[in-house]
Amino acid sequence: MNAEQAEQAAPGGLAPAGPRNDYYIPQWEERTSYGVRRVDPYTKLFEDRIIFLGTPVTDDIANAVMAQLLCLQSMDADRQISMYINSPGGSFTAMTAIYDTMNYVRPDIQTICLGMAASAAAVLLAAGAKGQRLSLPNSTVLIHQPAMGQATYGQATDIEILDDEIQRIRKLMENMLATATGQSVEQISKDIDRDKYLTAQGAKEYGLIDDILTSL
């Protein structure tokens, strides 16, 4: 199974984290009252109300995550949803789409960092329900300022417009992190000027998570 097939095999297109390498997602058959069905780990996790964000945050991934959040709310609006995160970050607008949906749906969203939650993914980690933002002990959290994804060309006025948008995005991110952590906007602004790496303990002290897990 190649990377494209693996991505298609996962529910909602949620493929494994990291570059598009060959990766086999195990599947097996289960017998039900309706007959035999083929399942994979992502299906089983979803049935347990677990969403696994193990890729860069793209528009397609955001759509898949939002669909799962809305579907799980429709199935039971009172049961907690868990979101496991191992992501290098990605699109800011894709992140805000997930962020707003997390705040829109009725169930509490538990967030758990496995490995890394960087950039946009760190904001999603911190956006979980208070008291339910968790991390495994050796995970890493990275926060930093938004950046342009590619070289910018064009007229000076166009570049000025883009700069204004980046500053707007930065202020929005600062407010999101300040709300989640209890840190002042001024402190957040200072800290994200450069890459700020945090251990699980450092993320807890900073207010990005609430506790460190020793087992799941």
Swiss-Prot record:
Gene designation per UniProt: clpP1
Purpose: Cleaves peptides in various proteins in a process that requires ATP hydrolysis. Has a chymotrypsin-like activity. Plays a major role in the degradation of misfolded proteins.
Keyword tags: Cytoplasm, Hydrolase, Protease, Serine protease
HAMAP family from the UniProt entry: ClpP
Catalytic activity: Hydrolysis of proteins to small peptides in the presence of ATP and magnesium. alpha-casein is the usual test substrate. In the absence of ATP, only oligopeptides shorter than five residues are hydrolyzed (such as succinyl-Leu-Tyr-|-NHMec, and Leu-Tyr-Leu-|-Tyr-Trp, in which cleavage of the -Tyr-|-Leu- and -Tyr-|-Trp bonds also occurs)
GO biological process, one term: protein quality control for misfolded or incompletely synthesized proteins
Pfam families per the UniProt record, alphabetical: CLP_protease
SUPFAM superfamilies: ClpP/crotonase
EC number: 3.4.21.92
Name by which UniProt lists this protein: ATP-dependent Clp protease proteolytic subunit 1
Keyword NADP on entry: no
GO cellular component: cytoplasm; endopeptidase Clp complex
Family: Belongs to the peptidase S14 family.
Quaternary structure note: Fourteen ClpP subunits assemble into 2 heptameric rings which stack back to back to give a disk-like structure with a central cavity, resembling the structure of eukaryotic proteasomes.
Places the protein is found: Cytoplasm
One GO molecular-function entry: serine-type endopeptidase activity
